[in-house]
């Protein structure tokens, strides 16, 4: 069973789309799940299944810790049911306007280094 990369992006965001396209190159190593963050957090979105308290906590955590990320990536281990935050910002080159803005070697390294169960995320 492969680990899962969960990509939280925004609709109509070219950087999010380019990151998603680049990460697709890792699909032989990971299952990849793309999540539209706005739809996810809508009142009737998928986050509503968490219940009001957990949903509110999740929204608060996103706002507090991930608001400076255009796109967020987590890795998920389906066997242990643990998640880890992946610091994608280290792999991005914003001078590029296509999927080459993601340095896949750096991203792979960040995915491997991401520690399960660490929250809030430790960023350098």
UniProtKB/Swiss-Prot annotation:
Disulphide linkage map: 13-16
RNA-binding keyword on record: no
Highest taxon listed in the record's lineage: Viruses
Keyword Electron transport included in the entry's annotation: yes
Pfam families: Glrx-like
GO CC, alphabetical: host cell cytoplasm
Cellular location(s): Host cytoplasm
InterPro entries in the record: Glutaredoxin-like (IPR008554), Thioredoxin-like_sf (IPR036249)
Membrane spanning stretches: none
Keywords: Disulfide bond, Electron transport, Host cytoplasm, Redox-active center, Transport
Induction summary: Expressed in the intermediate phase of the viral replicative cycle.
Primary role: Glutaredoxin necessary for virion morphogenesis and virus replication. Functions as a thiol-disulfide transfer protein between membrane-associated OPG128 and substrates OPG095 or OPG053. The complete pathway for formation of disulfide bonds in intracellular virion membrane proteins sequentially involves oxidation of OPG072, OPG128 and OPG088. Exhibit thioltransferase and dehydroascorbate reductase activities in vitro.
Subunit structure: Homodimer.
Protein family (similarity comment): Belongs to the glutaredoxin family.
Name of the protein: Glutaredoxin-2
Species annotation: Vaccinia virus (strain Ankara)
Organism placement in taxonomy: Viruses, Varidnaviria, Bamfordvirae, Nucleocytoviricota, Pokkesviricetes
């Amino acid at each position: 069973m492969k680990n899962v990369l969960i990509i939280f992006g925004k609709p109509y965001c070219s950087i999010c789309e380019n990151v998603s396209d680049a990460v697709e190159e890792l699909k032989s190593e990971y299952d990849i799940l793309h999540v539209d963050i706005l739809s996810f957090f809508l009142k009737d979105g998928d986050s509503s299944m968490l219940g009001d308290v957990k949903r509110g906590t999740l929204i608060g955590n996103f706002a507090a810790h991930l608001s400076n990320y255009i796109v967020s990536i987590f890795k998920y281990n389906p066997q242990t049911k643990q998640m880890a935050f992946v610091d994608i910002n280290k792999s991005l080159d914003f001078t590029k306007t296509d999927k080459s803005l993601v340095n896949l070697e750096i991203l792979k390294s960040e995915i491997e280094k991401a520690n399960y169960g660490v929250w809030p995320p430790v960023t350098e």
